[in-house]
């Protein structure tokens, strides 16, 4: 695991999956005073290292999910074994996290280990923080991104796969509607963050050509 500070209040954990290529998996910590908010948990075997890293920064306060796929939620049950903290995702994601229905692009329901524990995100969930969530459907129906308003840092989950200079869509077969996902990417032109951070890829600085080039290259 590699822990890096991306901005004053945002830290990034990087792990690697071998499936069979090496794929980086990023999760994040948002520091607020002595408290730490965890954005995504990675898979279960990442949890112990992630917990140690979080405790070095502050006191775990809550888990915020971008969506319910296993490489984002798989470690959540381990966190809840250690800490009595709430876990949140968008309302539209809960029936998949709870195993009530499979994702529209899958045949089997998810086994998240936190069924009927995850609470719906509301405006009040983050009202005390300089953090805002935005619904960005396509990769999954209830996918969200999180924007730290002070640090101007956008945590995009699987909305994009990023390289140093370009945006790319998530893997099509793991996405419900790739064109809807690409349309959701317009959020970056609405927010205009300084830094864009994805779950799988490199940090990239925002510029006004990024999304235009992305649409031209990938939108059907």
UniProtKB/Swiss-Prot annotation:
EC number: 3.-.-.-
A Pfam match: Lactamase_B
Cofactor note: Binds 2 Zn(2+) ions per subunit.
MF terms in GO: hydrolase activity; metal ion binding
SMART domains linked: Lactamase_B (SM00849)
Keyword Ribosomal protein: no
Cofactor field: Zn(2+)
Keyword Zinc tagged: yes
Record keywords: Hydrolase, Metal-binding, Zinc
InterPro entries, A to Z: Metallo-B-lactamas, NDM-1-like, RibonucZ/Hydroxyglut_hydro
Amino acids binding Zn(2+) 2: 71-72, 158, 200
Binding site for Zn(2+) 1: 67, 69, 139, 158
UniProt record similarity statement: Belongs to the metallo-beta-lactamase superfamily.
UniProt protein name: Probable metallo-hydrolase YybB
Originating species: Bacillus subtilis (strain 168)
Source lineage: Bacteria, Bacillati, Bacillota, Bacilli, Bacillales
Gene that produces this protein: yybB
